[in-house]
Curated annotation (Swiss-Prot):
Pfam families: IF3_C (PF00707), IF3_N (PF05198). GO terms for cellular component: cytosol; membrane. The 66 residues C-terminal tail is not present in other species. Belongs to the IF-3 family. It comes from the Bacteria. Keywords: Cytoplasm, Initiation factor, Protein biosynthesis. This is Translation initiation factor IF-3. The keyword Hydrolase does not apply. IF-3 binds to the 30S ribosomal subunit and shifts the equilibrium between 70S ribosomes and their 50S and 30S subunits in favor of the free subunits, thus enhancing the availability of 30S subunits on which protein synthesis initiation begins. Residues 207-217, 233-247 have a biased composition (Low complexity). SUPFAM superfamilies: Translation initiation factor IF3, C-terminal domain, Translation initiation factor IF3, N-terminal domain. One of its GO terms (biological process) is ribosome disassembly. GO terms for molecular function: ribosome binding; translation initiation factor activity. The gene is infC.
Amino acid sequence: MIREQRSSRGGSRDQRTNRRIRAREVRVVGSDGSQLGVMPLEAALDRARTEGLDLVEISPMASPPVCKIMDYGKFKYEEKKKASEAKRAQVTVLLKEVKLRPKTEEHDYEFKVRNTRRFIEDGNKAKVVIQFRGREITHREQGTAILDDVAKDLKDVAVVEQMPRMEGRLMFMILAPTPKVAQKARELVRQAATAAKRPPPPGAPGAGKSAAGASSGAEEKAEETAEEKKEAQAAPAAAEAQSPTAS
């Protein structure tokens, strides 16, 4: 599996393999993880070639560089697979905007705080905005008081990531999940990703449905064929019994 690999003009960020390794001597780790010691590069390449594998430089800064005999294509595939699984397990953090007014009714306030709580419990952030209209802008303390109430009502699940500030006629703050809530959200995402990869258990709805259906269909077909044969054999005898005797 020794392959000649030429680097592009801009170089490559991949590990050096086979003939791209520049050192004259290398410390070699076998495909089974055993230490094979220091040897000339050509000897290491011959050993990898004998096993039908690649020689991969894993510690280029060591003296001499450390190389391992492995299937480099399989190694890259596994690395890509691990990166993909890690990416699926990551929590995508969203920023939800929650709009309130200086004179928000109590039921509207409670409704929006409940929704904000659920959103934060999912591992997301919330931008709580107070909209001022007309002369309401002269009473900014009302907006500050509402934002303080929101922060207090959600203190068990959220922390203030950005303190209240003005932007035009808007006052806003940003809430983020507490470390405990964020960790729980990440764990739920990981569990969901793991469950999605598992095949359904034998007794689960739909498991083995196609095989069972095929087997049942075959049995029914066999029964129908047997019945048809019996009817075909019985038909001549019945016809002879019913026919008049020749005179």
